[in-house]
């Protein structure tokens, strides 16, 4: 009798050693090189196929949208995918090994006898369903063994996903850095402040890479271009489209062409590069210091506001539709206006007006105009601060604006 007990203990010890070696071997193989997630699950399947006590097995792993069958032994994977976990299981409600019949899963689950949950940081990350168990000794032996194997696998899968996420995050960070560099190069480094006019700008991006653009270009000794634009989308694609827009604009300005030619050419350039999938709203104005006249085109953009010294307000509306959505512009009207002394011109993007309070009331052009009329004689930097302070106070989202905010103001002396 004693000899039989010793033999049994030796068999159990050898089995435990074999199981430990198996788990360690699997752990080594899974970390030896960068396996894909599918390869990791396949390695576990091959390991389990060599275990004579494992006849029926399913491994459900938690993924983004619930649990998914990743390993199936003793049945077809497509058949296993038809099995549905109960809400209790989906919520991670089974945290200890349990008889499947106690879960009342239905006849489709009759071949499975035991469910072994796999926990990481006290959260259920997988379930192992086992069937074909010969006796209670086999059941008790398999619980820690399969739990250890599954835990090793899930750990390797999580590490692989974290590694992939780190690579993806690094790529996104690099993309953001490139887009930020491109965007920084687009904006003018200095703005005119001379005997004829003074210009100020403010730019508050909603995300790390905004979709707004502004520019001031000295064409010759008398004329300069004022431009504010809003590009659809964000990120590198938007910054590249913005770069194309600026390059085309500056090339046309160097050639000495008029707005009536510049705008259709820019539209054609944008349509050719984006295929009509992206667009730009823009305001382009050319001011002549000598004649005090402003020629402009409003391409589907927010109307700039011109405040005269006598209190009159003019919205600069003439122009065309947004650029880049069609190959040929259906209409184009170049506006022209004289700028009296002591006038104030405000160009901006829709991030300044499309701000909503707790009752869903919009700040709008009326709100912008009200701030301008109260503060029009403030120094331009302080005027910008007051505009930003006003929309911040109005917004239901405190300092979080729903879009980029760009302000370009010009005071004519």
What are these regions (language model features)?
Residues 1-33:
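Signal-transmission linkers at sensory-effector interfaces
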Residues 7, 125-149, 234, 333, ...:
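Regulatory loop-to-helix N-cap segments in sensory/regulatory domains
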Residues 45-49, 57-82, 221, 231:
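GAF sensory/regulatory domain recognition
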Residues 67-108, 316-319:
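Acidic/proline- and glycine-rich, intrinsically disordered low-complexity segments
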Residues 101-104, 110-120:
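A short, aliphatic-rich beta-strand micro-motif
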Residues 137-158, 244, 340-341:
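Amphipathic alpha-helical "output/dimerization" segments
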Residues 163, 167-346, 398-413:
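… and, occasionally, acidic/histidine-rich disordered N-termini of signaling adaptors
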Residues 237-255, 339, 343-398:
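Active-site-proximal, acidic helix/loop segment immediately C-terminal to a metal-coordinating Asp/Glu
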């Amino acid at each position: 009798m004693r000899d039989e007990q010793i033999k049994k203990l030796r068999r159990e010890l050898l089995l435990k050693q074999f199981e430990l070696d198996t788990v360690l071997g699997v752990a080594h193989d899974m970390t030896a090189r960068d396996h894909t997630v599918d390869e990791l699950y396949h390695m576990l399947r091959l390991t389990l196929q060599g275990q004579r006590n494992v006849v029926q097995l399913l491994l459900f792993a938690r993924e983004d949208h619930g649990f998914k069958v990743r390993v199936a032994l003793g049945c077809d994977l497509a058949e296993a995918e038809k099995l549905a976990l109960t809400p209790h299981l989906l919520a991670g409600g089974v945290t200890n090994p349990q008889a499947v019949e106690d879960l009342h899963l239905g006849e489709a689950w009759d071949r499975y006898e035991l469910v072994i949950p796999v926990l990481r940081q006290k959260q259920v990350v997988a379930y192992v369903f086992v069937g074909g168990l010969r006796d209670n000794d086999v059941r008790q032996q398999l619980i820690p063994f399969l739990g250890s194997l599954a835990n090793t696998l899930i750990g390797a899968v999580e590490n692989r996903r974290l590694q992939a996420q780190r690579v993806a995050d690094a790529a996104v960070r690099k993309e953001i850095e490139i887009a930020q560099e491109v965007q920084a190069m687009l904006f003018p480094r200095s703005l005119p402040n001379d005997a004829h006019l003074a210009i100020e700008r403010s730019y508050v991006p909603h995300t790390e890479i905004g979709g707004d653009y502004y520019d001031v270009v000295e064409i010759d000794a008398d004329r300069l271009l004022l431009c504010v634009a809003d590009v659809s989308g964000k990120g590198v694609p938007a910054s590249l489209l913005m770069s194309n827009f600026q390059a085309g604009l500056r090339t046309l300005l160097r050639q000495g062409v008029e707005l009536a030619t510049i705008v259709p050419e820019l539209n054609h350039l944008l349509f050719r590069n984006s295929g009509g999938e992206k667009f730009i709203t823009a305001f382009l104005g050319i001011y002549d210091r000598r004649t005090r006249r402003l020629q402009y085109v409003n391409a589907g953009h927010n109307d700039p506001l011109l405040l005269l010294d006598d209190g009159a307000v003019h919205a600069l509306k003439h122009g065309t539709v947004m650029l880049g959505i069609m190959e040929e512009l259906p209409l184009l009207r170049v506006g022209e206006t004289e700028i009296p002394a002591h006038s104030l011109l405000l160009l901006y993007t829709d991030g300044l007006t499309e701000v909503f309070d707790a009752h869903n009331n919009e700040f709008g052009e009326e709100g912008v105009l009200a701030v301008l009329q109260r503060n029009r004689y403030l120094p331009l930097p302080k005027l910008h601060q007051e505009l930003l302070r006003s929309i911040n106070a109005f917004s239901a989202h405190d300092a979080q604006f729903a879009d980029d905010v760009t302000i370009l103001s010009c005071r004519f002396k």
